[in-house]
Structures are given as structure tokens and as C-alpha cells.
Amino acid sequence: MTMSTFKRIAVTNRSLCSASLKEQVEKICKAGLCNALILREKDLAEQDYMSLAMSIKLICDKHRIDFFCNNMPSVAEKLKCNLQLSYQSFLDQKWKSGQITWVSVHTVEEAINAERLGADGLIAGHIFVTDCKKGLAPRGLEFLKEVCTAVSIPVFAIGGIDDSNSDAVRLAGAQGECRMSWYMRY
């Protein structure tokens, strides 16, 4: 796998931004720092999320960045955009969006099952120590290798990824990496 095919995925968290989220997304998209963006604003009610998603999707579309709604299938359906779901939310889904759906997994068994049930890609983590999962031991590169070997769909690593360990993630077989803090503080 060449560096050009390795996906860089921004995961939002507006509480980490010094500017507005829209300004931050514009900045990272314009700079060409990511190939995809997951709007992960867990504290928003659906209507507020929808409003934010519409404006963030416009920015992503302008810069040809793949846009994913996080755990908001009805918003993804209305906006006709990609969807990223937790494993449990994916299991609970009664319909397939028709859009690209990535699923977060934390075990090899979840990865295999998500692929069997139609996931288009997996987000595996957390791989390294991260402030987002304080007190939880990271699953590590061996876990990532096992997931990548067990499935045939793309696997993207998440959790504590930075410039010092990005190559290790790629060499473990991941087809991309997700970063939150790095993008939100860029």
C-alpha cells in the first residue's frame, strides 16, 4: 500500500477547537490534510446536529472530502451522506442506508460480524493511549493486525495516533488512520 492510498480521517470535536468548528473544518480541508471527515458531536440533539451537518458537509463537498455522519442514521439518510456507527448501533439498524457505512469495532469477532452484516469499512481501536479513553488500556498494534487480517474490507485505526506512530499503523495493515485532537488543534 502506498502513502497516497492511505486514508487520513479527521474526527470532529468542537470543544477542542480554538476557532469555530466550521472555520477549523474549512482550514483542514482547504490545506488538504484529510481525505474524509467524521462529524462526531455526541452532545448535540438531532436537529442541532442536522443543522451543523448541513454546513460541514458543504465545506467537505467543496474540497472533495468524504463526509460521514456519526451515529445519526436519519441525518445521513436526509443528507444522502456516508454513515459511521458504533458496533451496537450498527446491530440495531433495521435498514441499510444505501450509503457507505463504517462501523467502530473493539474485538476481532465484532470486525468479522460487522463485515458479514454488510459494513463497508471498520474503525478499529483504540490502538494507542489517548485522552479520549482515559484509564482504558489501548488494544495495540497486534489487535490492529489481527483485525486487518480477519476481514477483507478497509480497516481504519483510531486512538492516540500521531506522526510518531502513523507508519506503524500503516505497516500493521490499516488502510487509514483517524485523528481527532491533531485536526481540531491544527
Per-region residue spans from a language model:
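Short, well-ordered coil/turn segments that N-cap beta-strands
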Residues: S4-R8, L33-N35, H63-I65, L79-C81, ...
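N-terminal ligand-binding/catalytic initiation module
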Residues: T2-T5, Y183-R185
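Alpha-helix-loop-beta-strand connector modules within alpha/beta enzyme cores
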Residues: M50-C69, F90, W95-T107, G135-G160
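Glycine-rich phosphate-binding active-site loops on the catalytic face of alpha/beta enzymes
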Residues: A10-R14, K42, L85-W95, I123-G135, ...
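Active-site mouth loops of central-metabolism enzymes
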Residues: S4-K22, I100-V105
